């Protein structure tokens, strides 16, 4: 496959991943991990998905290690881990 074809395929896969709605059954497994600040001493405002409250919450990330349940914005956390609300149109 040519590099142009691979680039097109990558673009289509990225678009599909962004537009596919998240449900509780296909939510990524890392969304169920606890917030992990990591071992370093930076002070980075981040967000994690709290599977008990079903909300994205703020925490302070130390800058290294940690886990994949770590997002730079609340919106990115919601897009990745939170199921859309039923009966609500946006």
Curated annotation (Swiss-Prot):
Site annotation Reactive bond for chymotrypsin: residues: 41-42
Regions annotated as coiled coil: none
Pfam family, one: Kunitz_BPTI
GO CC term, one of those recorded: extracellular space
GO molecular function, one term: serine-type endopeptidase inhibitor activity
Gene3D superfamilies linked to this entry: Pancreatic trypsin inhibitor Kunitz domain
Domain named BPTI/Kunitz inhibitor: residues: 31-81
Proregion positions: 85-90
Protein's cellular compartments: Secreted
Entry annotated with the keyword Secreted: yes
Range of residues in the leader sequence: 1-24
CDD domains: Kunitz_PPTI-like
Keywords per UniProt: Cleavage on pair of basic residues, Disulfide bond, Protease inhibitor, Secreted, Serine protease inhibitor, Signal
Disulfide bonds: 31-81, 40-64, 56-77
Expression by tissue: Expressed by the venom gland.
Function, in words: Serine protease inhibitor.
Similarity field: Belongs to the venom Kunitz-type family.
Record's protein name: Kunitz-type serine protease inhibitor C4
Species of the source: Daboia siamensis
């Amino acid at each position: 496959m040519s590099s142009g074809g691979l680039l097109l395929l990558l673009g289509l896969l990225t678009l599909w991943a962004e537009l596919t709605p998240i449900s509780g059954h296909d939510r990524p497994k890392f969304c169920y991990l606890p917030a992990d600040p990591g071992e370093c001493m930076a002070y980075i405002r981040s967000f994690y998905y709290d599977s008990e409250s079903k909300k994205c919450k703020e925490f302070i990330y130390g800058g290294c290690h940690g886990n994949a349940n770590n997002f730079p914005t609340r919106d990115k956390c919601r897009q990745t881990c939170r199921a859309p609300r039923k009966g609500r149109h946006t």
